[in-house]
Amino acid sequence: MCSIGEDDFGDDGATHAMVVESLPLGIVLSPGNCSKCDVNSGELYKLNFRTAECRECFLAYARHKFRAALGAAKILPRNAEVLLVLDGSAESLVLLDMLHFAQTQNTFKRLHCNARVVYVEEQKVQGRDPVHLEALQNLSTQYAPFDFYVIELGALPSSMQRIKDYSPSLNANNELIHKLQKLRSLTARQDYLQQQRKNLICSVAQCLQCTHVFESNISVDLATQLLTAIALGRGGSAALDVALLDDRLSGDVKLLRPLKDLNEQEIQFYIHAQRLKPLFEKGSCFGREHGQTASLQNLTSAFVANLQQNYASTVSTVFRTGDKIAANSNPEQSSCVHCRSTLDSEISDTLLAIEYSRTVSEAGVSLYKSGQDLEGLAKKRLENKDGLCHACRAIQAELDSGNLL
């Protein structure tokens, strides 16, 4: 089986739990001989727990992780139609560059798939100015012959345009923005926005007749995603939230995360080696400007970032734990109409306790009712066939008015 360098994730025990040095903010130029090819280089790349190597050897190592993730599981059929999601982050540019490199190799080494790129414009939803169109056009030219498309988050899939025809929409009447404003907590807004983004990407893939979608999540992102899913009550689907393959999307569209085995340091080094220019800084996601304690997602992200800085192997342990969780793949169980997660088939004591607490809170001055009546009402709510999972039902409960869908 193809190895992807698992020793670099600090899974070898207590020795890797020791803090050798903080992750570098950039590349330190240190000329010398490459430990791999023994060629003298003016710039060596020293990853944690690896010997220093030249630019060519580092790029070969990083690209091998990308190819090994897809090749080991054999989940990408030959000549598959692939949609790469570009969000302007460093990770998405690395994924774009790696896929383009794999597409331009000779026949023997070439990754045989037909790729398209879609840039999801999220700046209007976040209250920021849209990305410079010139930067997107430069990417389109640099990574020809990929077809580049642009769609705004919250817009209809039919509004998608090619990059050469795109101009930012001047219509301020965005239904998604209005719905986000109706949600009381930032936690619910971020969760709802994430699900809407995933559903939009699925619809775009169907419009372009793509069977597979590439997302640029790396190991630290997936560790954060795993803990966040559990905190939000999405534990039943947490395995698919961090897996290489997520098959919950409608229309038989499969979501792949081929960068799942890369870490932040490798992304930084790759960006420098290829002289890539991210469109946005890391951490510019929706709601991050409100601080670490403003939502469960922000708090979890800050917690994992602190672990990554001081105890990098712990993040690897969290991420690897997610790999070992078995996904619930019972085809007979219904799925949530919003997030496509498997619905709970039985009423658990935990869900009943949560719903009972919500019922008591909403009863207010009507607490003269007997405990039996309140418990019965809580059970009735759980048995309500609204097609929503527990986490999506919590978002629905926060809406001041209207329906989640």
Curated annotation (Swiss-Prot):
* Organism superkingdom: Eukaryota
Name the UniProt key words of this record, in alphabetical order.
Cytoplasm, tRNA processing
Q: Name one GO biological process term.
A: tRNA wobble uridine modification
Question: Where is it located?
Answer: Cytoplasm
Alphabetized Pfam families for the sequence: CTU2
May I have one GO cellular component term? cytosol
Name the pathway it acts in.
tRNA modification; 5-methoxycarbonylmethyl-2-thiouridine-tRNA biosynthesis
Q: Which residues form the signal peptide?
A: none
One term of GO molecular function: sulfurtransferase activity
Q: Which PANTHER family has this protein been placed in? A: CYTOPLASMIC TRNA 2-THIOLATION PROTEIN 2
Q: What does this protein do?
A: Plays a central role in 2-thiolation of mcm(5)S(2)U at tRNA wobble positions of tRNA(Lys), tRNA(Glu) and tRNA(Gln). May act by forming a heterodimer with NCS6/CTU1 that ligates sulfur from thiocarboxylated URM1 onto the uridine of tRNAs at wobble position.
Please report which protein family the annotation says this sequence is part of.
Belongs to the CTU2/NCS2 family.
What name has this protein been given in UniProt?
Cytoplasmic tRNA 2-thiolation protein 2
Q: Which organism is it from?
A: Drosophila sechellia
